[in-house]
């Protein structure tokens, strides 16, 4: 019981701090999405930032190939049976990510013409900048993998700070540079935007290297030999589930941009609604990052009672918080329409 209470206290503490950074980041993101982008960019220019990100999210999920949940679930086994100098799980994860990103890079010239046929007529600005999906995807893959290993060593607060808060601050600075005339060419703006995720990638990579918690190991261990089949099945199941989840969240924007008469302008309007929905997802994101290592350890120890308590307590907390956020959003819909203007009504 004492161990469980300590685990819940750790999860609660990390969730609170993570939620603070995530909500602060969302406040800045809301200022960017609900005010700055609609006011200082055309709907097509705003829509381009959203559609590039949505395409990159789908491709990055493909490139991670289900390795992230595998790393989280099976790292306790590697930690228990191997010293960190012989733990090759991080090497396996990053190597597979590198291979998938390399395949995407070399196959993109063959994929691009197919995509251009879909978007060129209704979203010509996307056709001119579709190649920027590559740096966005690669940086998202790198950040996702680094984030998982930051969670494993307990640096969930730092990972959430970099991904949710720091990134949006940098986006705000780039937008302000556009507003102040320091950037006067939209091509330069969108080029900068596509590379912004590399900033938290570099910072988080440096922190993990300084921690000396992981090493590059190219020798197959007995743990990998024992669990490789189970890891492949587990990763494959999660991969298919996550792909469907990401597509469900992003395909509507892509379809609107390719089929709607307004193209990216209509996609920008739809983005406002989807952004408000993601606000309700914040508590879940912060709690997952804090609870997942604890859940993985409980699975490894076969502590079903702890798993039962963790799932029930986190689910109850998330239900209460999300219900409150939904109520606030519904009550403020008229205010959102008033601020955004008639184009977004």
Language-model-detected regions and their locations in the chain:
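Signature of the first transmembrane helix
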Residues: 10-70, 101, 105-109, 136, ...
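Membrane-interface junctions at transmembrane-helix termini in multi-pass inner-membrane proteins
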Residues: 11-12, 74, 139-162
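Interfacial transmembrane-helix starts/ends
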Residues: 12, 50, 83-98, 232, ...
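Hydrophobic alpha-helical transmembrane segments
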Residues: 131, 161-177, 181-212, 274
